């Protein structure tokens, strides 16, 4: 009988950083809209390193690009994307298209910085976690950019909405209650499959976490496993609310990228 694995966040998971010298390039244009800019940070003096593409949170209506505190031997691409309600944008699919464009840019350009394009991971917090899942699970967005979700090394959404994002619904004119789950073409849950990249979904713990957030991510992971996926994990960070899921969860992004998810917890 298949089941999904749940990891417990503990102090031992906190990262230990070696001294690594890095370089940074800011405000790189990855698509024509003015907000479509990204920052790149990469380790000097080494090659073939992995890269995390990081999408910020903010409900798809606010926030800005930033790096996260992980081992600096891992490159980071921090992304700005267009926001709903800004410059008349009301279609949530356009936010996903921006995210896909940034991932495509990374696949096409990270080798110029010394990175391995076969080691590109996608991650993000909250709205950024939603974008992570949409880009990495819904194949049409990367296909529009000439790429395939199979090119990604892994997905690590942190407290992302697995149903249709509440602000995507709001700006589309949906007036139903926020916590009434909707699953359609703009919901990651619609794309559960054994064929998506390796995925680790990281959330806070109910009842502290955002309502329904942990439960719907558990459903996403368990559905992928039931469909035959053998590299899918769910992480529950004890006592963490939505904000603390970020600080408690980022170390697991690092563990995932470095292949340090304990073998005993791999999905069977």
Give residue spans per PLM region.
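Short beta-strand element of the alpha/beta-hydrolase
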Residues: 48-58
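Short amphipathic alpha-helix adjacent to the substrate-entry channel of hydrolases
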Residues: 64-80
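Alpha/beta-hydrolase active-site loop
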Residues: 90-111
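N-terminal cap/lid segment of alpha/beta-hydrolase-fold proteins
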Residues: 19-46
């Amino acid at each position: 009988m298949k089941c999904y694995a749940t990891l417990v966040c503990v102090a031992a998971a906190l990262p230990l950083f070696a001294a690594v010298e890095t370089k940074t390039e800011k405000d790189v244009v990855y698509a024509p809209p003015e907000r479509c800019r990204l920052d790149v940070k990469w380790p000097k003096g080494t090659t073939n390193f992995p890269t995390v593409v990081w999408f910020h949170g903010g409900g798809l209506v606010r926030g800005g690009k930033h790096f996260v505190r992980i081992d600096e031997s891992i490159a980071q691409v921090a992304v700005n994307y267009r926001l709903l309600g800004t410059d008349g944008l009301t279609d949530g699919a356009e936010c996903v298209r921006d995210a896909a464009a940034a991932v495509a840019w990374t696949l096409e350009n990270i080798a110029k910085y010394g990175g391995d394009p076969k080691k590109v991971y996608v991650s993000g917090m909250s709205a950024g976690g939603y974008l992570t899942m949409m880009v990495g699970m819904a194949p049409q967005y990367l296909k529009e950019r000439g790429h395939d979700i199979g090119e990604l090394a892994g997905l690590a959404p942190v407290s992302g909405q697995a149903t249709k994002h509440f602000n995507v619904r709001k700006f589309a004119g949906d007036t139903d209650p926020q916590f009434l789950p909707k699953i359609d073409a703009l919901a990651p849950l619609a794309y559960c499959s054994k064929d998506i990249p390796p995925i680790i979904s990281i959330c806070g713990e109910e009842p502290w976490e955002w309502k329904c957030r942990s439960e719907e991510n558990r459903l996403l992971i368990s559905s992928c496993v039931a469909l035959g996926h053998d590299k899918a994990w769910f992480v529950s960070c004890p006592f963490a609310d939505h904000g603390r899921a970020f600080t408690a969860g980022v170390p697991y992004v690092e563990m995932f990228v470095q292949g340090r998810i304990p073998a005993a917890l791999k999905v069977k």
